[in-house]
C-alpha cells in the first residue's frame, strides 16, 4: 500500500512539475525575474521591463536579454529555426510575440545596451513614438534584417 501511495505521489509530482515548465513550442514567454535575472548576452541584471525580451525553443530551453537589439544580434548569429521570440510592450510592459509587434528604432530611445528599439502591441502607439523621434515603425522582419547595424544617433 505504501509503495502504491509513493508511486501515485511521484506521478502527481511529475505532472505538476511538467505543467509549470516552459511549454513545448515556446507558447509562453521566458521566465524573467526583474532585478535578479542575468542577461544571457551581456551578463547584466535585467531590470527594465520595457526592453526585456527573450526567446523559447521547442525543447523549452530559453534565453533572456535586457535589450532587444542585443537579442536580435544573437538570433542573427545562431539562427534557431524553432525559436518563439517575445518582447515587452514599451508602455504596458506586457509580453507580446515579436512577430506581431510594431517596433520603433531610434538613437533617442535609451535602452540598456543602446539598441534603440522599443516594441508595441499596437500600431497607433508605435507611430506616436516614431513621430516624436522623427523615425518610422518597423516589423519584426525589418528589425531582423537590420540586426547588427549601428543605431542612428550613436
Annotate the PLM regions.
Residues 83-154:
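Thiol/selenol-based redox catalytic cores and closely related redox-interacting motifs
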Residues 28-35:
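Short, flexible, mixed-charge glycine/proline-rich loop motifs
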Residues 35-72:
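Post-signal-peptide N-terminal segment of Sec-exported extracytoplasmic proteins
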Amino acid at each position: 500500500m505504501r509503495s502504491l501511495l509513493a508511486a501515485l505521489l511521484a506521478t502527481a509530482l511529475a505532472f505538476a512539475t511538467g505543467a509549470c515548465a516552459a511549454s513545448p513550442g515556446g507558447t509562453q514567454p521566458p521566465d524573467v525575474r526583474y532585478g535578479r535575472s542575468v542577461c544571457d548576452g551581456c551578463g547584466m541584471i535585467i531590470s527594465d521591463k520595457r526592453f526585456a525580451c527573450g526567446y523559447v525553443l521547442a525543447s523549452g530551453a530559453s534565453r533572456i536579454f535586457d535589450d532587444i537589439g542585443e537579442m536580435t544580434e544573437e538570433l542573427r548569429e545562431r539562427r534557431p529555426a524553432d525559436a518563439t521570440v517575445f518582447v515587452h510592450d514599451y508602455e504596458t510592459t506586457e509580453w507580446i510575440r515579436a512577430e506581431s509587434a510594431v517596433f520603433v528604432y531610434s538613437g533617442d530611445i535609451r535602452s540598456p545596451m543602446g539598441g534603440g528599439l522599443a516594441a508595441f502591441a499596437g500600431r497607433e502607439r508605435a507611430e506616436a513614438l516614431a513621430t516624436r523621434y522623427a523615425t518610422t515603425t518597423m516589423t519584426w522582419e525589418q528589425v531582423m534584417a537590420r540586426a547588427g547595424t549601428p543605431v542612428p544617433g550613436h
